[in-house]
Design a protein with these regions (language model features):
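Extended ligand-binding regions for polar small-molecule ligands
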Residues: 154-155
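Glycine-rich, positively charged active-site loop/lid region within alpha/beta enzyme cores that binds
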Residues: 133-151
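Catalytic alpha-helical scaffold of carbohydrate-active enzymes acting on polysaccharides/glycoconjugates
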Residues: 1-134, 158-174
Length: 174
C-alpha cells in the first residue's frame, strides 16, 4: 500500500517540475507523520494541501456528528502541524461524506469540498454557517472505479485521462 509514497509521488514531482506546475494534494493526516520528506518537498514547491482524512481506511459514513466533527478537526490540525498550512480544501477518503460533512467543514473554516460529482462547474453549497464551494471531481478518471468496477487496464485508463485533458483544454480555450 505504500508504493505511492515510496515511488509514485517522486515520479509525479519530477513530471510536475519538468513543466513548472504546482499541485493540490489530497493529503491523509498520517502522511505528515509517516513521510515528512514528502511534506518538505511539497512545501518547497508551493503545493496546496487538501484534507483527505487520517488515512483511507476510516470513512465518514456511520459517524455521529460529534465524532465526525472531531475527526475533521483532528485531521486539519495534523495537516497544519505537519505542513505549516491549514488546509482550505477537503476530499473525503473514498470520496465519502455524511449529511453533516459540508456543515462541519464550513464550521472548521474549510473553503471548498471536492466530494460531489454532480456538476462540472464550481457551485456554492448551502451550509449552516460560513460558506463552502463544491469543486468538481472527475470520478470518471479515478483509478479505483475504473479498475475495480469497469475492469479498465493501464492503457485504457491512460487514454481516458488524455481524452479528458484534451476536452478540458479545448473547452478552456473558448
Amino acid at each position: 500500500r505504500d508504493y505511492g509514497n515510496r515511488v509514485g509521488i517522486w515520479r509525479m514531482m519530477e513530471s510536475l517540475d519538468k513543466y513548472g506546475m504546482r499541485s493540490t494534494v489530497c493529503l491523509n493526516g498520517e502522511v505528515c507523520r509517516e513521510y515528512p520528506e514528502i511534506i518538505e518537498e511539497g512545501n518547497k514547491r508551493g503545493w496546496e494541501w487538501m484534507g483527505h482524512g487520517h488515512n483511507n481506511s476510516q470513512l465518514l459514513p456511520g459517524l455521529d456528528e460529534d465524532t465526525e466533527r472531531s475527526l475533521i478537526n483532528d485531521v486539519l490540525a495534523a495537516i497544519e502541524k505537519g505542513t505549516g498550512h491549514r488546509p482550505k480544501g477537503w476530499l473525503g477518503p473514498y470520496v465519502s461524506e455524511t449529511y453533516n460533512t459540508p456543515d462541519l467543514l464550513a464550521e472548521a473554516g474549510v473553503e471548498y469540498l471536492c466530494d460531489f460529482c454532480c456538476d462540472d462547474q464550481p457551485f456554492e453549497m448551502n451550509v449552516k454557517s460560513g460558506s463552502l464551494i463544491s469543486m468538481p471531481y472527475s470520478v470518471e478518471v479515478n483509478d479505483l472505479p475504473l479498475a475495480l468496477y469497469f475492469g479498465a487496464g493501464g492503457q485504457e485508463m491512460g487514454q481516458m485521462i488524455r481524452d479528458q485533458f484534451d476536452v478540458l483544454y479545448a473547452e478552456a480555450a473558448d
